[in-house]
Design a protein with these regions (language model features):
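Amphipathic alpha-helical coiled-coil segments
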Residues: 19-34, 109, 113-132, 143, ...
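Periplasmic alpha-helical coiled-coil/stalk elements that build and connect Gram-negative outer-membrane
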Residues: 112-223, 324-327, 331, 372-373, ...
Length: 429
């Protein structure tokens, strides 16, 4: 399995991403609801019952003042919005902005899950190397311990040397057990992220060439390209359109109304009535208990809230980028030194073994060299994977991880229109 395949499996199967996709699909339906405001409404109203009427027409009949009849009525009515204070176009724009927000949020979720997949993928590879190092270290201790035990049995070695050798052997075995548990944990995390077991994992190529030359370029890419930031900007647009929607009640509403009706025995008059009408109807609210004004003010505050959320998102993303960049730079400086440490320690062990064959080193000296080599190799492995993962963190912060890994995201991750963030970091003084 390659790293790209692992990320693709995560994107295809992770429930967190599926939840975001369903959120987008729900927003798509809201757009259809909003566009329904452009279409006419057609209603059929019908009724049947008994009606008692006391009216001038019934009183004119003489003998009694009331008329009780079985009545029925039916009306077919069409109403087409002509002007609604720009409510419908602004509501359509608001829901479309929400769709864009959900689409970019899917992208952001996919980027986060991809980075998590990279983390668990590299962790499995690292832990497998750690297990191999611990196993080799244990085998080296067993060889030396066998030699010390043999010398002790022949009366050449001391009991103290044997005890010390046994203690170091126990520690080496314990180190192997610990690394095996760490590997099992890493494999469990891998399955949780990808939904697949980590069988044969290919070592991914280094992404050193994918990282910008300096943090300023990376920061600019974050501001231009990070999907979470674009999602927050789309929420700002949605809040602005919600403010325009809140203005609609301050305008009169005009509708074209077409209706036809058929009635029997209504209003105390026996007989059948057929009517039709065509009219432009105006509805203009003059006072609504100040509720419309309060809704407008609430929408204005929502705009400010969404802008603050967007600006805070940029600060968090910039912080994450800076931390990832610092970790990358630190690991880059440490990796060559850790490699030198491992190389020189390996040479020292070889020299110790040669000196031991000449009688210039003891078996305990060999154990010391084995422990030193194990520590050096563990350190080099740790720093090497830390450097690699920190580079992936930088790429993910820029919103480029999925693209560079050629991962196919769901169709719902595509926004209706491109969104450019207007957030800017405060000046650094």
């Amino acid at each position: 399995m390659t790293l790209s395949e692992a990320i693709q499996s995560t994107v295809d199967n992770h429930p967190e991403l599926h939840a975001s996709v369903n959120d987008r699909l729900s927003a798509d339906e809201d757009v259809k609801v909003a566009k329904g405001g452009y279409l006419p409404t057609v209603d059929l109203i019908a009724g049947y019952g008994r009606e008692q009427t006391d009216s001038p027409s019934t009183r004119a009949l003489g003998n009694h003042n009331k008329e009780t009849l079985n009545y029925s009525d039916a009306e077919l009515r069409l109403r087409q919005m002509l002007f609604d204070g720009f409510n419908t176009p602004n509501e359509v724009a608001r829901t479309q902005a929400t769709v864009n927000s959900r689409a970019y949020y899917i992208q952001g979720t996919a980027e986060s899950l991809a980075l998590r997949t990279v983390e668990v993928y590299l962790e499995v590879l690292k832990r497998r190397e750690m297990v191999a190092l611990a196993r080799n270290n244990l085998q080296a201790h067993e060889r030396v311990n066998d030699q010390i035990k043999l010398r002790s049995e022949r009366g050449v070695g001391s009991t103290a040397d044997l005890d010390q050798s046994e203690a170091r052997l126990a520690l080496a075995a314990n180190n192997l057990y610990t690394e095996e548990v760490n590997l099992a944990d890493a494999e469990a995390n891998f399955f949780s992220s990808t939904g697949r077991l980590p069988d044969e994992l290919e070592q991914p190529a280094s992404v050193k060439g994918e990282v910008p030359e300096n943090i300023e370029l990376a920061r600019q890419t974050v501001m231009d390209n990070n999907p979470y930031l674009k999602s927050a900007q789309a929420d700002v647009y949605a809040a602005e359109k919600q403010y325009e929607v809140a203005k609609a009640p301050f305008y009169p509403r005009f509708d074209l109304e077409l209706a036809t009706s058929a009635d029997d025995n209504v209003q105390g008059d026996e007989g059948h009535y057929n009517t039709w009408r065509a009219a432009v109807v105006m509805n203009y609210n003059l006072f609504n208990g100040m509720r419309d004004k309060a809704r407008l003010q609430a929408a204005a505050h929502s705009i400010n809230q969404s802008m603050d959320i967007r600006n805070n998102a940029l600060r968090v993303l910039n912080e994450n980028l800076a931390l990832a960049w610092n970790a990358m730079e630190n690991a880059r400086m440490q990796t060559p030194k850790a490699r030198d440490y491992a190389d020189y320690t390996a040479r020292s062990r070889e020299a110790y073994q040669q000196q031991f064959s000449l009688g210039q080193r003891t078996l305990l000296d060999l154990l010391d060299s084995e422990n030193e080599l194990f520590t050096a190799n563990r350190r080099y492995t740790e720093v090497r994977y830390t450097e690699e993962f920190s580079m992936y963190r930088v790429i993910s912060a820029m919103g480029e991880l999925l693209r560079k890994q050629n991962v196919v995201v769901p169709a719902e991750a595509v926004a209706l229109t491109e969104v450019k963030s207007e957030a800017r970091l405060p000046e650094m003084r």
